[in-house]
């Protein structure tokens, strides 16, 4: 009942946000013509779809590296299949948790698979993804920091605030990695034996220490994370040109981490409405992109991911021989 109410709330918020955006920018006048322009700019749409596909493949490569760090020897083809399918559950569930749940459950069926290492690999996957996005954003931010004073107050505050957020996140990730080391954990266990002596917690921390044990793999995973976001953000850059707009690449790269973070908030379904408003605000401030064009480009960028999500759904049905009841089971476990 609680999950149903939560979903209804998100659907309601999504509907209201989209209605307000479409009403403000007169959907049939300022937004719809940009969708029609995609017929003439189809190569940009195709390029965007390819970039999304590359980012998904790189996500599978990164996860495979982390799985090896957890001593889970699973074939590259299987990791790629589960990663592609997880995108289907990301767009059909109430959030990323659906895709993450499938990633664990999908590999649990493999011989020798263990639940804790799989769960930790997914958690570390997100952690190193955050690190990669932080490095990319701060690099782009530094590249045009000399222009910050020329921006409007709203955009300036958003960029400054996100810079502090990303900087703080990188520091916290670094502290977390250090806290996973056996020497520091053993010291802490002597100080607080009742809390840190809890065996399941010790097993969890030992699994997380794979970041240090396989430090070469961790560095490779961070570098791949940067590439993942570059290709993901390139798909939105292509979507701008697909709807007939233009925008410098550097500004798009700087804005997209903020857009992704806002869309990831558990407010609306798939970030709809929140993503469009954030994208519109930042693109207009950084590049002068008209509001209607920005909203259309944001929706097209999202639809590119939806298309790959539907491909993941087809792969799920074909390779797993899954029924609707199995899908419902995955969603129930995700909730």
What are these regions (language model features)?
Residues 92, 127, 131, 227, ...:
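Residues within alpha-helical transmembrane segments of multi-pass membrane proteins, especially transporters
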Residues 57-62, 95-104, 250, 264-279:
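Transmembrane helix boundary and interhelical junction motifs in multipass membrane proteins
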Residues 87-97, 114, 126-138:
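Mid-bilayer segments of alpha-helical transmembrane spans in multi-pass integral membrane proteins
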Residues 1-84, 143, 148-264, 289, ...:
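Predominantly cytoplasmic-facing regulatory/coupling regions of multi-pass membrane proteins
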Residues 266-270, 277-302:
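Hydrophobic alpha-helical transmembrane segments in multi-pass integral membrane proteins
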Residues 77-81, 99-100, 111-126, 289-300:
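Membrane-interface alpha-helices at helix entry/exit sites of multi-pass transporters
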Residues 76-105, 109-110, 117, 263, ...:
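Hydrophobic alpha-helical transmembrane segments of multi-pass membrane transport proteins
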């Amino acid at each position: 009942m609680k999950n149903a109410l939560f979903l209804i709330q998100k659907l309601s918020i999504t509907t209201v946000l989209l209605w307000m955006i479409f009403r403000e920018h007169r959907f049939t006048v300022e937004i719809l013509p940009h969708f029609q322009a995609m017929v003439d700019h189809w190569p940009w749409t195709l390029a965007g779809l390819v970039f999304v596909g590359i980012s998904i493949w790189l996500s599978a490569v990164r996860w495979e590296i982390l799985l090896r760090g957890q001593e889970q020897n699973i074939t590259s083809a299987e990791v790629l299949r589960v990663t592609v399918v997880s995108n289907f559950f990301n767009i059909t569930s109430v959030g990323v948790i659906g895709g993450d749940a499938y990633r664990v459950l999908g590999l649990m069926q493999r011989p020798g698979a263990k639940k804790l290492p799989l769960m930790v690999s997914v958690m570390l996957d997100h952690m190193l993804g955050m690190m990669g996005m932080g490095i990319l954003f701060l690099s782009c931010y530094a590249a045009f920091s000399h222009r910050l004073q020329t921006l409007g107050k709203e955009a300036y505050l958003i960029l400054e605030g996100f810079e502090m957020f990303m900087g703080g996140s990188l520091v916290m990730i670094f502290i977390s990695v250090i806290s996973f080391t056996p020497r520091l954990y053993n010291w802490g266990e002597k100080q607080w034996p009742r809390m840190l002596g809890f065996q399941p917690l010790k097993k969890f921390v030992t699994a997380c220490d794979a970041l240090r044990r396989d430090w070469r793999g961790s560095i490779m995973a961070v570098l791949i994370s940067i590439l993942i976001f570059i290709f993901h953000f390139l798909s939105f850059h292509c979507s701008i040109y697909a709807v007939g707009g233009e925008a410098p690449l550097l500004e798009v790269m700087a804005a997209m981490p903020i857009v992704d973070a806002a869309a990831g908030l558990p407010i609306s379904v798939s970030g709809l409405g929140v993503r469009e408003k954030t994208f519109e605000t930042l693109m207009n401030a950084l590049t002068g992109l008209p509001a209607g064009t920005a909203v259309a480009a944001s929706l097209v960028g999202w639809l590119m991911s939806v298309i790959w999500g539907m491909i993941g759904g087809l792969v799920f049905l074909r390779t797993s021989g899954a029924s609707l009841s199995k899908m419902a089971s995955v969603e129930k476990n995700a909730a």
